[in-house]
Every structure is written in structure tokens, then in C-alpha cells.
């Protein structure tokens, strides 16, 4: 691909191959219509307003779907292995939060017991009036 400028305009000659499936966007999204795009492998993709939205695939659709799922799983596993420290931090943070919650619950039990003791003492000091 080559480009040149004329005044304030820039012109390009040749093909532009994008790794993004922009031709799958609807017409109202501002995407040029009737333009053949390409998928991430460089295979042609019919335009979004085409009557046949198909990919040029080599294998069957089941094989293609299985390969895509395997690729996604491998990518996720690699990401998890690379960011394992992040998961350890999250686990440690959760343990700290559980410890703090345990302290709060213990304190709440102590306060409840003190309230019951005070209520019992108040009941002894002020016997209920007999309304019979």
C-alpha cells in the first residue's frame, strides 16, 4: 500500500487489510457498505449488507468452532498463569475481609450479652407494676 498527499487530502493506493470485523457492524454504525473485509486470519468476509454473511472457512463449522473454543481456553489459561499473583492478592484480601467480619460479629455478640445483662438488672431494680 502506498499513500500520497494532494493539498489537504491524503490518498492511498492498494488494499487495506484490517484484523477487525468491522463489516459485521450495522449500516447505521457508519461503516462503509458493500466492502469485502477480512477476519483475523485474513480470509474474506462478505459485507454487512450482503445477503450471504459467510466466512471462507477451510474446515467444517464444527471444526472451526472447536478450534476457536480451544484457542480461547488456551488464551484464558495463559492469562491466568501470567496473572496468578493477582488471584493471590484477591484471596488474601478476601481473607482479611472475613477476619474483619469475624471481629465485628464477635464484638456484636459481646454487646448483645451486655445489653441482656443490663436489661436483667433494670428489671430487678424496677419491678413491673401490677395492673390487676
Curated annotation (Swiss-Prot):
Keyword Membrane: no
The keyword Zinc appears for this protein: no
GO biological process terms held by the UniProt record: symbiont entry into host cell
Domain of life assignment: Viruses
Induction text: Expressed in the intermediate phase of the viral replicative cycle.
GO molecular function, one term: hexon binding
Coiled coil: 101-121
Pfam families for this protein: Adeno_PIX
Keywords attached to this entry: Capsid decoration protein, Capsid protein, Coiled coil, Host nucleus, Host-virus interaction, Virion, Virus entry into host cell
GO cellular component, one term: viral capsid, decoration
Record's subcellular location: Virion; Host nucleus
HAMAP family noted in UniProt: ADV_CAP9
Job description of the protein: Structural component of the virion that acts as a cement protein on the capsid exterior and forms triskelion structures consisting of three molecules that stabilize three hexon trimers at the center of each icosahedral facet and fixes the peripentonal hexons. Dispensable for assembly. During virus entry, recruits the anterograde motor kinesin-1 to the capsid docked at the nuclear pore complex thereby subjecting the docked capsid to a pulling force.
Entry's free-text remark on domains: Three N-terminal domains of hexon-interlacing protein form triskelions between hexon capsomers.
Oligomer and partners: Homotrimer. Interacts with hexon protein; this interaction tethers the hexons together. Self-interacts with adjacent proteins. Interacts with kinesin light chain KLC1; this interaction leads to capsid disruption at the nuclear pore complex during virus entry into host cell.
Additional note from the record: This protein is only encoded by mastadenoviruses, and may therefore play a role in mammals tropism.
Family in the record: Belongs to the adenoviridae hexon-interlacing protein family.
Name of protein: Hexon-interlacing protein
Record organism: Human adenovirus F serotype 40 (HAdV-40)
Lineage, broadest ranks: Viruses, Varidnaviria, Bamfordvirae, Preplasmiviricota, Tectiliviricetes
Amino acid at each position: 500500500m502506498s499513500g500520497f498527499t494532494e493539498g489537504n487530502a491524503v490518498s492511498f493506493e492498494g488494499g487495506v487489510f484490517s484484523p477487525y470485523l468491522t463489516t459485521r457492524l450495522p449500516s447505521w454504525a457508519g461503516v462503509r457498505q458493500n466492502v469485502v473485509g477480512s477476519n483475523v486470519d485474513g480470509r474474506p468476509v462478505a459485507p454487512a449488507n450482503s445477503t450471504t454473511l459467510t466466512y471462507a472457512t477451510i474446515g467444517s463449522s464444527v471444526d472451526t468452532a472447536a478450534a476457536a473454543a480451544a484457542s480461547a481456553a488456551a488464551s484464558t489459561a495463559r492469562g491466568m498463569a501470567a496473572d496468578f499473583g493477582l488471584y493471590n492478592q484477591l484471596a488474601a484480601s478476601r481473607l482479611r475481609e472475613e477476619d474483619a467480619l469475624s471481629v465485628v460479629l464477635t464484638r456484636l455478640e459481646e454487646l448483645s450479652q451486655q445489653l441482656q445483662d443490663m436489661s436483667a438488672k433494670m428489671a430487678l431494680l424496677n419491678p413491673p407494676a401490677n395492673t390487676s
